[in-house]
Amino acid sequence: GIEVFSGLLMHEADQQLRVWLTANRNKRTYVTLKWASSLDGRAAANDGTSKWISGPESRTESHQRRAKVDAIMVGTGTVLADDPELTARKPDATLFDHQPLRVIMGERDLPPGARVFNDSAETLQIKSRSIPAALDELYSRGVRHLWVEGGPQLASDFVRQNLVDEF
């Protein structure tokens, strides 16, 4: 006869499929929160600038991870302060083949010339402060994995509402 074993490598399989399993079980987009802070726990320098508080290796890894998610989100404050492009770039600054949907969360108007509106990737502005409503909207659009980059207010709101699946 044939001997059957079940449950082998179950944890490993769950880990590999965690995004899909969580999104489908909860009918909600899986959320990964990228969090960088200075040694004193701040998300910006003392003078308010926030260009980069992480190192080059961390930025390279972040771009590689961006290329593997469905969408990347920041708040309007981050767009106004930093003018990010929110693309997934290789170390030589060329774009990865897959570019995540760029999602801007918040009610403030943004300048039409902001880099998030260039043609490198699609951009969606959700003019709301309701994170659950935003996640519903993204899930309905087929977004199963969201990478939240901040700023600090948006990141804190995700944590406070217990809507982060992975840090």
What are these regions (language model features)?
Residues 18-147, 152-156:
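Active-site ligand-binding patch in enzyme domains
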Residues 154, 158-166:
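Short acidic amphipathic segments
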Residues 4-6, 95-97, 164-167:
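Short hydrophobic/aromatic-enriched beta-strand-loop microsegments
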Residues 1-14, 157-159:
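Zn2+-dependent cytidine deaminase-like catalytic core
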